[in-house]
């Protein structure tokens, strides 16, 4: 194998867990990556980057299609509509390099099962984001500090 930092191998598909571990020349572990098969159930999961946000500051909320254990379902795709109470939606989108919607829209298509909402916290005690794609919905509340 050439020393170009790329290892490539084929593995037959089988549900479960696949773990890759890299080692240096002395046998010390350098890194580890795990892929786990998602379950049948699908839901939208909303996870804020931090547990609290200061009034007037930005809160980043990751929206994902997951199974009941929180495993991301990258092949699930949908248009997620976001509503915010106690704050202002300042951006909504995904990491797709050819994203065609405005980031100021309240609806975003998911990319590999994910989207990101950016909310500016208001002056109240908390902000609540509700995400709905017509089949699944979720809400998350983030306490606002002053």
Each predicted region: which residue ranges?
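Long hydrophobic segments that form regular secondary structure
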Residues: 1-31, 66
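Short, hydrophobic beta-strand segments
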Residues: 7-13, 102-123
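Exposed beta-strand face motif in extracellular beta-rich ectodomains
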Residues: 14-18, 59, 125-127
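Beta-strand-rich structural segments
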Residues: 21-22, 56-74, 80, 129-130
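Edge beta-strands of extracellular beta-sandwich domains
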Residues: 27-39, 136-145
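Low-complexity, Pro/Ser/Thr- and charge-rich linker/hinge segments at domain boundaries
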Residues: 35-56, 146
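Short aromatic-acidic-glycine turn motif
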Residues: 41-45, 83-99
């Amino acid at each position: 194998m050439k020393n170009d930092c790329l290892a490539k191998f084929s593995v037959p598909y089988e549900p479960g867990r696949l773990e890759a571990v890299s080692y240096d020349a002395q046998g010390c572990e350098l890194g580890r990556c795990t892929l786990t098969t998602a379950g049948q159930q699908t839901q939208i999961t909303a996870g804020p980057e931090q547990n609290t946000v200061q009034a007037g500051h930005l809160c980043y909320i990751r929206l994902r299609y997951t199974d009941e254990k929180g495993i991301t379902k990258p092949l699930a795709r949908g248009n997620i509509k976001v509503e915010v109470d106690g704050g202002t939606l300042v951006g909504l989108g995904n990491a797709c390099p050819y994203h065609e919607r405005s980031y100021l829209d309240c609806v975003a298509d998911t990319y590999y099962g994910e989207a990101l909402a950016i909310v500016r916290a208001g002056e109240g005690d908390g902000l609540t984001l509700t995400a709905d794609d017509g089949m699944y919905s979720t809400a998350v509340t983030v306490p606002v500090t002053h």
